[in-house]
């Protein structure tokens, strides 16, 4: 167990995108906001929508809906920035519809995916949270690493939001 995991045991960041609830491990959260201004990067391609400056760092901003194969619903009402443990260079921001907040979710309420390479209806799926209503737990660490390396094949799995 890492120090970050010990500081935030069983804690997850919850957000809404396209009317659906998603979550990821809170230990990866660097910042969450209801709005962050960013400079758009037109015609850049891919899922990069812009860049922003936060706490003296330039942060790329990606379209989370596009990464998950969903239809983009502008304008975003929320922003989350993720930083991978032990790396300063893998700081990435994402547009989301709404930042809900933190949730304590006991391990018994999480159904992990058996195999990370299994074909799933949602790119970057790590598991399912079964707390009242079932919603996806995303593998943000894998998502950020793949986007940073240019390996975006997992984000092309879906072509429509009906799968989410």
Language model: regions and residue ranges:
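An acidic, low-aromatic, low-complexity terminal/linker signal
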Residues: 1-164
């Amino acid at each position: 167990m890492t120090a970050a995991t010990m500081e935030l045991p069983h804690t997850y960041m919850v957000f809404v995108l396209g009317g659906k609830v998603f979550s990821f491990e809170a230990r990866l959260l660097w910042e969450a906001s209801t709005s962050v201004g960013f400079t758009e990067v037109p015609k850049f391609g891919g899922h990069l929508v812009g860049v922003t400056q936060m706490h003296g760092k330039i942060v790329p901003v990606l379209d989370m809906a596009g990464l998950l194969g969903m239809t983009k619903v502008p304008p975003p009402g929320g922003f989350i920035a993720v930083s991978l443990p032990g790396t300063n260079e893998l700081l990435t921001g994402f547009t989301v519809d709404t930042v809900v907040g933190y949730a304590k979710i006991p391990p018994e309420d999480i159904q992990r995916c058996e195999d990370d390479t299994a074909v799933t209806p949602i790119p970057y799926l790590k598991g399912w949270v079964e707390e009242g209503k079932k919603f996806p737990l995303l593998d943000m660490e894998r998502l950020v690493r793949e986007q940073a390396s240019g390996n975006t094949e997992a984000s092309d799995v879906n072509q429509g939001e009906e799968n989410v």
